[in-house]
A protein has these predicted regions:
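FAD-binding core/adjacent interface of flavoenzyme oxidoreductases
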Residues: 2-4, 73-158
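Beta1-alpha1 glycine-rich phosphate/pyrophosphate-binding loop at the start
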Residues: 2-76, 81, 155-159
Length: 159
């Protein structure tokens, strides 16, 4: 059999995972997933994590477990630092990886449309950490509101 083509997929969101699942069926490819986290999570349910209805473990699944049955997939936890197209390599904070094909599946970034005060004050909810931060802020404000001596203070904490 010919040598496997090296495919590096940076980003383990829906797009990256779906591509990897399709490519993994073809043994001509050896696939490396690079992601900053060692788990995939289901963003549509982040609001339930932030409201304490479910725990983060209910919406996250380890990449290594997801692909443990596949011999042509490996996981590299790290952050993309640099792409070297001439050398067909990428550099991460945890080493250099060679590729024949590179897929950048990095997701989205919130656009605050230049409103720095909104960016500073907002409680975003795009990651599990952000959902937990929102949850903790909500719970702390509710606790503080129960001890507030004035209605205006209670309203400020609850709105």
């Amino acid at each position: 059999m010919a040598e496997q083509k090296k495919v590096v997929v940076v980003g383990g969101g829906f797009a990256g995972i779906n591509l990897i699942k399709k490519l993994a069926k073809d043994k001509r490819f050896h696939i490396t997933l690079v992601d900053i986290h060692n788990y995939h999570f289901f963003p549509p349910l982040l609001y339930q994590v932030s409201t304490a209805f479910i725990e983060p473990s209910n919406i996250s699944y380890p990449f290594r477990r997801m692909f443990q049955e596949k011999e042509n997939i490996r996981f590299h936890m790290g952050t993309l630092q640099k792409v070297n197209p001439e050398a067909n390599t990428i550099e991460t904070n945890n080493g250099t990886l060679a590729y024949d094909y590179l897929v950048l599946s990095l997701g989205t970034e919130t656009n605050y449309f230049g409103m720095e005060n909104v960016k500073r004050s907002a409680l975003p909810m795009k990651t599990i950490d952000e959902a937990l931060n929102l949850r903790n802020t909500l719970l702390l404000n509710m606790e503080k509101a129960t001890r507030a001596k004035h209605k205006a203070e209670r309203d400020r904490l609850l709105n």
